[in-house]
């Protein structure tokens, strides 16, 4: 029997890096709403009292970047200078240029199906049947903890909470099956007038217990709630934030490989984002079809070229049909050319701001989380639903 521990972390929407991600994606959404064919690469930097938005944007749309920035920060919850950051008074600087025409000539084509990739690169998608959303449990529950922190902060259950928070969950596995939670870490920014004792009790009762399944908690589970003893200074006052610095939080919590490209602020012509979404869609449908218990997809591209340079399927010995068969099925059922995957997942819509906190995967509102190809994959592989005990 192989026993091991695996840990993943998440951060809240008020974490400085996530503020930056959300601003970048809010700008992207505002542009796509007017101009679905826009080329957007929007980067954001936040620090005490200021936000800088930069990058390359080519579009026919006009958007009010300052107001988008302030509204995003306002919705996150930084509305008072006592928190160290205030949507109403922070400076907003803009440094936006246009996308290079050298890139444009490689991407744009008269025949949309021949649209080239916006850059070279490699992307991964992953799925596992260990949770109902076909995601690894450590990252799934790390996300749910900080989502719950935001919920009880915003609805007034714990009004002394502040927007910045981090979570970390360690699961124990035996033979790749979950047997319990070994450790939970939750650090949350708070008002100065709350005691450590009251904070720890409230976080346990209102955040941790409602989120983590009781059957996974046991007397040996360790809890670390604000282990430094104080977290008053947080958000951009505590640390600067940058778009694209939480790529493992955004994906699979380290349980799967990562190609290195960030997502937020990029329009779907950037395969760093769109192909990673498509790879998740492929992997999730393979697992949903019962063709494997775990599946990782790698896809790669050359700039200006439509066809992927490679497609790889890894199932970690859990496959019910050969990986060669799975690779053929992927090529048959999924169009992974840039234009094809944009159409397949209907990506030219303003859906991206909501992806920028609490994970891009495992949340059913996003089109790449659909399992609408599972039945066709199963039938093509010659497997019946009953045979898979599904």
Curated annotation (Swiss-Prot):
GO aspect biological process, one term: S-adenosylmethionine biosynthetic process
Q: Does the keyword Metal-binding apply?
A: yes
EC numbers for this chain: 2.5.1.6
- EC class (word): transferase
Q: In which pathway does it act?
A: Amino-acid biosynthesis; S-adenosyl-L-methionine biosynthesis; S-adenosyl-L-methionine from L-methionine: step 1/1
User: Gene for this protein?
Assistant: metK
UniProt-listed SUPFAM superfamilies: S-adenosylmethionine synthetase
Mention any Pfam family matching this sequence: S-AdoMet_synt_M
Q: Which family does it belong to?
A: Belongs to the AdoMet synthase family.
Binding sites annotated in the UniProt record for ATP: 15, 164-166, 230-231, 239, 245-246, 262, 266
Query: How does the annotation summarize its subunit structure?
Result: Homotetramer; dimer of dimers.
Name of the protein this chain belongs to: S-adenosylmethionine synthase
Principal place where this protein is found? cytoplasm
Protein localization: Cytoplasm
**Comment on bound cofactor:** Binds 2 divalent ions per subunit.
> Where, in this chain's numbering, is K(+) bound?
43
Coiled-coil stretches are: none
Report if keyword Nucleotide-binding is assigned: yes
